[in-house]
Swiss-Prot record:
Its EC number is 2.1.1.195. This is Cobalt-precorrin-5B C(1)-methyltransferase. Transmembrane segments: none annotated. It is an enzyme of class 2 (transferase). Belongs to the CbiD family. GO terms for biological process: anaerobic cobalamin biosynthetic process; methylation. The gene is cbiD. GO terms for molecular function: cobalt-precorrin-5B C1-methyltransferase activity. It catalyses: Co-precorrin-5B + S-adenosyl-L-methionine = Co-precorrin-6A + S-adenosyl-L-homocysteine. Keywords: Cobalamin biosynthesis, Methyltransferase, S-adenosyl-L-methionine, Transferase. Pathway: Cofactor biosynthesis; adenosylcobalamin biosynthesis; cob(II)yrinate a,c-diamide from sirohydrochlorin (anaerobic route): step 6/10.
Length: 375
Protein backbone atom coordinates (compact mmCIF):
# COMPACT_ATOMS: atom_id res chain seq x y z
CA UNK A 1 0.00 0.00 0.00
CA UNK A 2 1.35 3.42 -0.93
CA UNK A 3 2.00 5.57 2.14
CA UNK A 4 -0.08 8.74 2.14
CA UNK A 5 1.67 12.09 2.28
CA UNK A 6 1.32 13.55 5.76
CA UNK A 7 0.05 17.09 6.26
CA UNK A 8 2.14 19.77 7.95
CA UNK A 9 0.65 22.13 10.51
CA UNK A 10 1.58 25.41 12.16
CA UNK A 11 3.07 26.10 15.55
CA UNK A 12 1.58 27.74 18.62
CA UNK A 13 3.85 30.69 17.82
CA UNK A 14 2.31 31.08 14.37
CA UNK A 15 -1.19 30.89 15.89
CA UNK A 16 -0.31 33.58 18.44
CA UNK A 17 1.08 35.81 15.68
CA UNK A 18 -2.06 35.34 13.57
CA UNK A 19 -4.27 36.21 16.55
CA UNK A 20 -2.25 39.37 17.26
CA UNK A 21 -2.45 40.48 13.62
CA UNK A 22 -6.23 40.00 13.36
CA UNK A 23 -6.93 41.71 16.70
CA UNK A 24 -4.62 44.66 16.04
CA UNK A 25 -5.95 45.27 12.53
CA UNK A 26 -9.50 45.13 13.91
CA UNK A 27 -8.64 47.69 16.57
CA UNK A 28 -6.80 50.10 14.29
CA UNK A 29 -8.50 49.68 10.91
CA UNK A 30 -11.89 48.27 11.94
CA UNK A 31 -11.13 45.21 9.83
CA UNK A 32 -13.09 42.08 10.76
CA UNK A 33 -11.13 39.29 9.11
CA UNK A 34 -12.34 35.72 8.72
CA UNK A 35 -8.87 34.56 7.68
CA UNK A 36 -5.38 36.01 7.94
CA UNK A 37 -2.18 35.85 5.89
CA UNK A 38 0.98 35.05 7.85
CA UNK A 39 4.58 34.64 6.71
CA UNK A 40 6.47 32.26 8.97
CA UNK A 41 10.10 32.46 10.03
CA UNK A 42 11.09 30.09 7.21
CA UNK A 43 9.20 32.32 4.73
CA UNK A 44 6.24 30.02 4.25
CA UNK A 45 3.05 31.94 3.41
CA UNK A 46 -0.03 30.69 5.24
CA UNK A 47 -3.71 31.58 5.11
CA UNK A 48 -5.15 30.78 8.54
CA UNK A 49 -8.86 30.82 9.44
CA UNK A 50 -10.02 33.04 12.30
CA UNK A 51 -11.90 31.15 14.99
CA UNK A 52 -13.29 34.12 16.92
CA UNK A 53 -12.88 37.91 17.01
CA UNK A 54 -14.16 40.36 19.60
CA UNK A 55 -13.68 44.14 19.45
CA UNK A 56 -14.35 46.72 22.17
CA UNK A 57 -13.55 50.43 22.41
CA UNK A 58 -10.01 50.05 23.72
CA UNK A 59 -9.09 46.42 23.07
CA UNK A 60 -9.62 43.51 20.71
CA UNK A 61 -9.15 39.78 21.15
CA UNK A 62 -8.85 36.97 18.65
CA UNK A 63 -8.75 33.17 18.82
CA UNK A 64 -6.97 30.94 16.30
CA UNK A 65 -7.44 27.17 16.33
CA UNK A 66 -4.15 25.29 16.52
CA UNK A 67 -3.63 22.95 13.58
CA UNK A 68 -0.87 20.35 13.86
CA UNK A 69 -1.51 18.59 10.56
CA UNK A 70 -0.75 14.89 10.95
CA UNK A 71 1.74 15.50 13.75
CA UNK A 72 0.69 13.89 17.07
CA UNK A 73 0.62 17.17 19.01
CA UNK A 74 -1.35 17.48 22.27
CA UNK A 75 -2.13 21.12 21.43
CA UNK A 76 -3.89 20.25 18.17
CA UNK A 77 -7.35 21.81 17.99
CA UNK A 78 -7.06 24.12 21.00
CA UNK A 79 -7.56 27.89 20.83
CA UNK A 80 -4.50 30.15 20.90
CA UNK A 81 -5.69 33.64 21.75
CA UNK A 82 -4.38 37.19 21.81
CA UNK A 83 -5.74 40.32 23.43
CA UNK A 84 -4.31 43.64 22.22
CA UNK A 85 -4.75 47.03 23.84
CA UNK A 86 -3.46 50.39 22.57
CA UNK A 87 -1.75 52.64 25.13
CA UNK A 88 0.50 55.68 25.19
CA UNK A 89 2.95 54.18 27.69
CA UNK A 90 3.76 50.54 28.37
CA UNK A 91 3.10 49.38 31.94
CA UNK A 92 5.68 47.50 33.97
CA UNK A 93 4.87 43.78 33.94
CA UNK A 94 7.37 41.38 35.49
CA UNK A 95 6.68 38.54 33.07
CA UNK A 96 6.58 40.77 30.00
CA UNK A 97 8.96 40.78 27.04
CA UNK A 98 9.53 44.44 26.17
CA UNK A 99 10.10 45.99 22.75
CA UNK A 100 10.02 49.62 21.54
CA UNK A 101 6.32 49.62 20.71
CA UNK A 102 4.88 46.64 22.57
CA UNK A 103 5.08 44.31 25.53
CA UNK A 104 4.27 40.61 25.10
CA UNK A 105 2.77 38.91 28.15
CA UNK A 106 1.70 35.35 28.79
CA UNK A 107 -1.81 35.18 30.20
CA UNK A 108 -4.02 32.33 31.36
CA UNK A 109 -2.82 28.94 30.11
CA UNK A 110 0.64 30.15 29.05
CA UNK A 111 3.37 28.85 31.32
CA UNK A 112 6.05 30.84 33.08
CA UNK A 113 9.64 29.76 33.51
CA UNK A 114 10.86 28.74 36.97
CA UNK A 115 14.15 26.99 36.17
CA UNK A 116 17.31 28.02 34.38
CA UNK A 117 18.50 26.48 31.14
CA UNK A 118 15.70 27.41 28.75
CA UNK A 119 15.67 30.07 26.03
CA UNK A 120 13.53 32.30 28.25
CA UNK A 121 14.77 33.80 31.52
CA UNK A 122 13.42 32.63 34.87
CA UNK A 123 10.28 34.54 35.83
CA UNK A 124 9.25 35.33 32.26
CA UNK A 125 6.34 33.98 30.24
CA UNK A 126 7.17 30.90 28.17
CA UNK A 127 6.90 32.63 24.81
CA UNK A 128 10.03 31.71 22.88
CA UNK A 129 12.22 34.05 20.79
CA UNK A 130 10.87 32.78 17.45
CA UNK A 131 7.22 33.67 18.19
CA UNK A 132 8.30 36.97 19.76
CA UNK A 133 10.12 37.84 16.53
CA UNK A 134 7.05 37.00 14.43
CA UNK A 135 4.73 38.99 16.70
CA UNK A 136 6.92 42.11 16.79
CA UNK A 137 7.31 41.99 13.01
CA UNK A 138 3.52 42.07 12.64
CA UNK A 139 3.19 44.90 15.17
CA UNK A 140 5.85 46.98 13.39
CA UNK A 141 4.13 46.46 10.05
CA UNK A 142 0.70 47.51 11.34
CA UNK A 143 1.77 50.44 13.51
CA UNK A 144 4.19 51.67 10.82
CA UNK A 145 5.87 54.40 12.86
CA UNK A 146 2.82 55.36 14.93
CA UNK A 147 3.34 56.68 18.47
CA UNK A 148 0.84 54.12 19.75
CA UNK A 149 2.09 51.23 21.85
CA UNK A 150 0.49 47.82 22.33
CA UNK A 151 -0.02 45.56 25.32
CA UNK A 152 -0.23 42.03 23.93
CA UNK A 153 -1.51 39.21 26.11
CA UNK A 154 -1.29 35.68 24.72
CA UNK A 155 -3.62 33.26 26.48
CA UNK A 156 -4.70 29.65 25.98
CA UNK A 157 -7.96 28.63 27.71
CA UNK A 158 -7.04 24.93 27.72
CA UNK A 159 -3.35 25.55 28.27
CA UNK A 160 -3.08 24.59 31.92
CA UNK A 161 -4.68 21.16 31.34
CA UNK A 162 -2.78 20.46 28.12
CA UNK A 163 0.54 21.35 29.74
CA UNK A 164 0.21 18.39 32.09
CA UNK A 165 0.54 16.12 29.03
CA UNK A 166 3.83 17.75 27.99
CA UNK A 167 7.33 17.95 29.47
CA UNK A 168 6.69 21.49 30.72
CA UNK A 169 6.25 20.63 34.43
CA UNK A 170 9.50 18.65 34.39
CA UNK A 171 11.29 21.46 32.57
CA UNK A 172 10.14 24.01 35.12
CA UNK A 173 7.50 25.71 32.95
CA UNK A 174 4.53 26.08 35.28
CA UNK A 175 0.89 26.96 34.72
CA UNK A 176 0.46 26.32 31.03
CA UNK A 177 1.94 25.45 27.66
CA UNK A 178 4.88 27.12 25.94
CA UNK A 179 4.40 29.23 22.82
CA UNK A 180 6.98 27.69 20.51
CA UNK A 181 8.37 27.63 17.00
CA UNK A 182 11.74 28.04 15.31
CA UNK A 183 10.29 28.02 11.79
CA UNK A 184 6.56 28.49 12.38
CA UNK A 185 5.70 25.20 10.69
CA UNK A 186 5.02 21.79 12.26
CA UNK A 187 6.43 19.17 9.90
CA UNK A 188 4.65 15.83 10.12
CA UNK A 189 6.23 12.60 8.99
CA UNK A 190 6.01 9.01 10.06
CA UNK A 191 9.34 7.61 11.23
CA UNK A 192 9.60 5.25 8.25
CA UNK A 193 8.74 7.98 5.76
CA UNK A 194 11.25 10.35 7.33
CA UNK A 195 14.01 7.73 7.21
CA UNK A 196 13.25 6.92 3.58
CA UNK A 197 13.32 10.60 2.73
CA UNK A 198 16.66 11.15 4.48
CA UNK A 199 18.24 8.09 2.84
CA UNK A 200 17.07 9.26 -0.58
CA UNK A 201 18.49 12.73 0.05
CA UNK A 202 21.80 11.27 1.21
CA UNK A 203 21.96 9.00 -1.86
CA UNK A 204 21.42 11.94 -4.20
CA UNK A 205 24.16 13.92 -2.44
CA UNK A 206 26.57 10.99 -2.79
CA UNK A 207 25.86 10.32 -6.45
CA UNK A 208 25.35 13.87 -7.69
CA UNK A 209 28.64 15.35 -6.48
CA UNK A 210 30.65 12.18 -5.96
CA UNK A 211 32.01 13.51 -2.66
CA UNK A 212 32.89 10.98 0.00
CA UNK A 213 32.22 13.28 2.97
CA UNK A 214 29.04 14.61 4.57
CA UNK A 215 28.00 17.02 7.32
CA UNK A 216 25.38 15.81 9.81
CA UNK A 217 23.24 18.20 11.88
CA UNK A 218 20.32 17.40 14.16
CA UNK A 219 18.02 20.21 13.05
CA UNK A 220 17.53 23.92 12.40
CA UNK A 221 20.06 25.03 15.02
CA UNK A 222 22.76 22.91 13.38
CA UNK A 223 21.92 24.20 9.93
CA UNK A 224 22.15 27.81 11.08
CA UNK A 225 25.42 27.08 12.89
CA UNK A 226 26.80 25.51 9.71
CA UNK A 227 26.00 28.71 7.82
CA UNK A 228 27.43 30.88 10.58
CA UNK A 229 30.83 29.18 10.65
CA UNK A 230 31.07 29.04 6.87
CA UNK A 231 30.78 25.32 6.17
CA UNK A 232 29.39 24.13 2.85
CA UNK A 233 25.66 23.71 3.49
CA UNK A 234 25.26 21.86 0.18
CA UNK A 235 26.96 18.93 1.92
CA UNK A 236 24.76 19.16 5.04
CA UNK A 237 21.89 16.84 5.83
CA UNK A 238 19.45 17.13 8.75
CA UNK A 239 19.39 13.78 10.56
CA UNK A 240 16.74 14.57 13.20
CA UNK A 241 17.01 12.03 16.03
CA UNK A 242 18.21 9.17 13.83
CA UNK A 243 21.96 9.16 14.44
CA UNK A 244 22.43 5.40 14.20
CA UNK A 245 20.26 5.00 11.11
CA UNK A 246 22.11 7.79 9.29
CA UNK A 247 25.53 6.39 10.20
CA UNK A 248 24.42 3.07 8.70
CA UNK A 249 23.12 4.90 5.62
CA UNK A 250 26.44 6.73 5.20
CA UNK A 251 28.35 3.45 5.45
CA UNK A 252 26.04 1.77 2.92
CA UNK A 253 26.55 4.66 0.48
CA UNK A 254 30.33 4.43 0.98
CA UNK A 255 30.95 7.80 2.55
CA UNK A 256 34.40 7.95 4.13
CA UNK A 257 34.08 10.98 6.41
CA UNK A 258 31.29 12.40 8.60
CA UNK A 259 31.46 15.86 10.17
CA UNK A 260 28.94 15.97 13.04
CA UNK A 261 27.62 19.37 14.16
CA UNK A 262 25.47 19.19 17.26
CA UNK A 263 23.93 21.29 19.98
CA UNK A 264 25.27 20.20 23.36
CA UNK A 265 21.81 19.02 24.51
CA UNK A 266 21.68 16.45 21.68
CA UNK A 267 25.40 15.75 21.37
CA UNK A 268 25.68 14.72 25.02
CA UNK A 269 23.34 11.79 24.33
CA UNK A 270 25.54 10.56 21.49
CA UNK A 271 28.57 10.92 23.76
CA UNK A 272 26.79 8.46 26.05
CA UNK A 273 26.25 5.94 23.25
CA UNK A 274 22.63 6.84 22.47
CA UNK A 275 21.91 6.73 18.73
CA UNK A 276 18.24 7.72 18.72
CA UNK A 277 18.11 11.05 20.56
CA UNK A 278 14.32 11.33 20.90
CA UNK A 279 13.37 12.00 24.52
CA UNK A 280 10.97 9.03 24.56
CA UNK A 281 13.70 6.60 23.50
CA UNK A 282 16.51 7.44 25.93
CA UNK A 283 17.91 10.21 28.06
CA UNK A 284 21.03 9.88 30.24
CA UNK A 285 22.09 13.48 29.53
CA UNK A 286 22.89 14.51 33.08
CA UNK A 287 24.53 11.19 33.87
CA UNK A 288 26.81 11.44 30.83
CA UNK A 289 27.62 15.08 31.56
CA UNK A 290 28.39 14.20 35.18
CA UNK A 291 30.69 11.36 34.10
CA UNK A 292 32.53 13.70 31.73
CA UNK A 293 32.79 16.30 34.50
CA UNK A 294 34.37 13.67 36.74
CA UNK A 295 36.92 12.84 34.02
CA UNK A 296 38.06 16.49 33.83
CA UNK A 297 38.30 16.70 37.64
CA UNK A 298 35.34 18.97 38.33
CA UNK A 299 34.57 19.45 42.01
CA UNK A 300 32.17 16.92 43.59
CA UNK A 301 29.64 19.65 44.39
CA UNK A 302 29.55 20.68 40.73
CA UNK A 303 28.97 17.09 39.66
CA UNK A 304 26.07 16.88 42.12
CA UNK A 305 24.60 20.10 40.67
CA UNK A 306 24.90 18.67 37.16
CA UNK A 307 23.01 15.53 38.17
CA UNK A 308 20.24 17.67 39.69
CA UNK A 309 20.01 20.02 36.69
CA UNK A 310 16.78 20.53 34.80
CA UNK A 311 18.41 20.97 31.38
CA UNK A 312 21.85 20.65 29.85
CA UNK A 313 21.98 24.43 29.46
CA UNK A 314 21.58 24.72 33.22
CA UNK A 315 24.24 22.05 33.76
CA UNK A 316 26.62 24.00 31.51
CA UNK A 317 26.23 27.03 33.77
CA UNK A 318 27.93 25.06 36.56
CA UNK A 319 30.89 23.87 34.49
CA UNK A 320 34.21 25.44 35.49
CA UNK A 321 36.59 23.30 33.43
CA UNK A 322 35.78 24.17 29.82
CA UNK A 323 37.92 21.31 28.50
CA UNK A 324 34.89 19.12 29.21
CA UNK A 325 33.45 20.18 25.84
CA UNK A 326 36.57 18.99 24.04
CA UNK A 327 36.16 15.66 25.81
CA UNK A 328 32.47 15.44 24.87
CA UNK A 329 33.22 16.23 21.20
CA UNK A 330 35.86 13.49 21.17
CA UNK A 331 33.36 11.07 22.74
CA UNK A 332 30.75 11.92 20.10
CA UNK A 333 33.23 11.25 17.29
CA UNK A 334 34.50 8.06 18.94
CA UNK A 335 31.03 6.64 19.65
CA UNK A 336 29.79 7.34 16.12
CA UNK A 337 32.89 5.82 14.57
CA UNK A 338 32.61 2.80 16.87
CA UNK A 339 28.94 2.37 15.89
CA UNK A 340 29.81 2.43 12.18
CA UNK A 341 32.16 -0.58 12.42
CA UNK A 342 33.51 0.42 9.03
CA UNK A 343 36.29 2.31 7.31
CA UNK A 344 34.81 5.72 8.07
CA UNK A 345 36.20 8.65 10.06
CA UNK A 346 34.00 10.89 12.20
CA UNK A 347 34.80 14.32 13.62
CA UNK A 348 32.52 16.46 15.78
CA UNK A 349 31.93 20.03 16.87
CA UNK A 350 29.40 21.04 19.51
CA UNK A 351 27.80 24.41 20.13
CA UNK A 352 25.61 26.20 22.66
CA UNK A 353 22.15 27.80 22.35
CA UNK A 354 24.00 31.07 21.71
CA UNK A 355 25.48 29.56 18.56
CA UNK A 356 29.03 29.50 19.90
CA UNK A 357 31.32 26.56 19.12
CA UNK A 358 32.29 25.23 22.55
CA UNK A 359 34.06 21.97 21.72
CA UNK A 360 35.79 20.23 18.81
CA UNK A 361 37.17 16.72 18.46
CA UNK A 362 40.92 16.35 17.93
CA UNK A 363 40.47 15.62 14.23
CA UNK A 364 37.78 18.22 13.47
CA UNK A 365 39.90 21.03 12.01
CA UNK A 366 42.04 18.59 10.01
CA UNK A 367 38.99 16.89 8.54
CA UNK A 368 37.30 20.18 7.65
CA UNK A 369 40.48 21.18 5.82
CA UNK A 370 40.91 17.85 4.04
CA UNK A 371 37.30 17.83 2.88
CA UNK A 372 37.38 21.42 1.70
CA UNK A 373 34.27 21.94 3.77
CA UNK A 374 34.77 25.70 4.15
CA UNK A 375 32.94 27.51 1.36
Amino acid sequence: MEEKELKNGYTTGTCATAAVKVALEALIYGKKATEVDITTLNYTNLKIPVQKLRVRNNFASCAIQKYAGDDPDVTNGISICAKVQLVKELPKVDRGAYYDNCVIIGGRGVGFVTKKGLQIAVGKSAINPGPQKMITSVVNEILDGSDEKVIITIYVPEGRAKALKTYNPKMGVIGGISVLGTTGIVKAMSEDALKKSMFAELKVMREDKNRDWIIFAFGNYGERHCQKIGLDTEQLIIISNFVGFMIEAAVKLEFKKIIMLGHIAKAIKVAGGIFNTHSRVADGRMETMAACAFLVDEKPEIIRKILASNTIEEACDYIEKKEIYHLIANRVAFKMQEYARADIEVSAAIFSFKGETIGESDNYQRMVGECGAIK
